[in-house]
Each structure stands twice: as C-alpha cells, then as structure tokens.
Swiss-Prot record:
The protein's Enzyme Commission number: 3.1.26.4
UniProt function note: Endonuclease that specifically degrades the RNA of RNA-DNA hybrids.
Organism of origin: Rickettsia typhi (strain ATCC VR-144 / Wilmington)
Name of the protein in its database record: Ribonuclease H
Pfam hit, one: RNase_H
GO biological process: DNA replication, removal of RNA primer
Substrates-to-products reaction catalysed: Endonucleolytic cleavage to 5'-phosphomonoester
NCBIfam families: PRK00203.1
Subunit structure and binding partners: Monomer.
Amino acid sequence: MDSKVVIYTDGACSGNPGPGGWGALLKFNDASKKIFGYELVTTNNRMEMTAALEALRVLKKSSIVEIYTDSKYLQHGITVWIHNWMKNNWCKNNNEPVKNVDLWQKLYSELSKHTIMWRWVKGHASNSGNIAADKLAVQGRETAMEILKCRG
C-alpha cells in the first residue's frame, strides 16, 4: 500500500526577479522533514514550483500525497492549465510561450510516480504547515542574499 505524505510548500523572492528561496515541510505518519534551498536570481513563481518539485523528489516510493501551496499559479498550472499547454506545444491559448516550461515538465514527470492532490491554502494566515514552509523559504532567500552580499 502507498504511504501517505502531507507536504507544505512555499517560495520567497526579494525582487521579481531577484534572490529567492524555497521551502517545504513533509509530514509522514509521526515523522517530518524540512528542506529548503535558494537561487541567486529567480522569480517567486519559480521558487513556488521548485519547492513542490524538490519535496516530491525526496519521496523514495510511490505515495499518496497532499501538497498544500499558497500559490494559485502552481495549483492551477499543474491541475488545469498544463494539459492544454502540452497539447499546444507549451504555448498558451494566445500563442505566447508558457513561462517556466523546464519546471512544469519536471513537475509533470513526478505526477506519474504518485497520487497527488494539490490544495490551495491562504498564505501568511493561521496554517502552521504553511507558516513553517514560509520560514524555510525565507531562510533560503536570506542565504541567497548573504551570498550576493559577500560577492559584492
């Protein structure tokens, strides 16, 4: 039987684009795992997507996954828009290319490995999982900012 995992994800960016971070809190039964990372120049949407992607990559076996995100871009993109984008060769209905195709394709490849429910949660509210993911994302962003500061 597949194991159940609950994941909270978030992204943070100073400027858009700018230094950014992503974070995720994974909960399995009685255990939890926190992960975070950064990019020196990125966007808020890329960090939101990276948080979900990296969290899914942590999972070593097929799982039933609930992903909570405060990004409607991520939730709608992966559950609604992606199917048309793929049919349209990664173009939107107005023939403009879809942004972040590299990450959408990587996320899509993770879908076949798990049963995933994508849930939207209001950001910066009272959801403890989202608050924890936000703190991790901010930690990643601050790391990126420190690196840039050291480089002058």
